[in-house]
């Protein structure tokens, strides 16, 4: 007779359930703080596993990038179509001090701008700020009907589009290279550069819906804790930042 396993025998404690451990008991919550350039500094919260042994929680948090709607940061629905990227540069207690990492438009806003009977002008330029951040800035614009125009279409000639694009690149290089990253952020919120492009190209061809649609951070200088703390205020405990007015003027350019 073949000898096999008796399935009727009890198999010890296999039937007992394992103790369920809540994974959130091993995690800590941290507050994300935006720079004082934005009105609302409390972006939200994020979590990470607690520091254990040689694993430090701060190392896992540094470099994290968060995408936030500009309407939430400014408390105004007028900015709902723009997204700001914030990067964690320093951990202070339970606060994460962030810095500007990029800007982008929502896809629905970009699609709503493109229409028939008009020409689209796009330009991009790689430029370094005065505090050594290398950025790639993308601009978008559309041709507009001239005063007393009867014709339905507003198409521009290729030569005119080249002139407009050249002017756009020139303005973006000038505006970005003469300011710091914090000053550039203050310009991007009220769309100062877009209005400057629209005003300067009137003699070439009238434009409408001129926007800086994207800002990409390519390279950043060596980390400086002092400048980051200055960007967040000395105590970095204020919940409100300073309001950027729509009629913003760059103080640095005036002094130069």
Swiss-Prot record:
<dbReference type="InterPro" id="IPR001593">
    <property type="entry name" value="Ribosomal_eS1"/>
</dbReference>
<feature type="modified residue" description="N-acetylalanine; partial">
    <location>
        <position position="2"/>
    </location>
</feature>
<dbReference type="GO" id="GO:0006412">
    <property type="term" value="P:translation"/>
</dbReference>
<protein>
    <recommendedName>
        <fullName>Small ribosomal subunit protein eS1</fullName>
    </recommendedName>
</protein>
<dbReference type="InterPro" id="IPR018281">
    <property type="entry name" value="Ribosomal_eS1_CS"/>
</dbReference>
<dbReference type="GO" id="GO:0022627">
    <property type="term" value="C:cytosolic small ribosomal subunit"/>
</dbReference>
<dbReference type="GO" id="GO:0005829">
    <property type="term" value="C:cytosol"/>
</dbReference>
<keyword id="KW-0687">Ribonucleoprotein</keyword>
<dbReference type="Pfam" id="PF01015">
    <property type="entry name" value="Ribosomal_S3Ae"/>
</dbReference>
<keyword id="KW-0689">Ribosomal protein</keyword>
<keyword id="KW-0963">Cytoplasm</keyword>
<dbReference type="GO" id="GO:0030446">
    <property type="term" value="C:hyphal cell wall"/>
</dbReference>
<comment type="subunit">
    <text>Component of the small ribosomal subunit. Mature ribosomes consist of a small (40S) and a large (60S) subunit. The 40S subunit contains about 33 different proteins and 1 molecule of RNA (18S). The 60S subunit contains about 49 different proteins and 3 molecules of RNA (25S, 5.8S and 5S).</text>
</comment>
<keyword id="KW-0007">Acetylation</keyword>
<dbReference type="InterPro" id="IPR027500">
    <property type="entry name" value="Ribosomal_eS1_euk"/>
</dbReference>
<comment type="similarity">
    <text>Belongs to the eukaryotic ribosomal protein eS1 family.</text>
</comment>
<dbReference type="GO" id="GO:0003735">
    <property type="term" value="F:structural constituent of ribosome"/>
</dbReference>
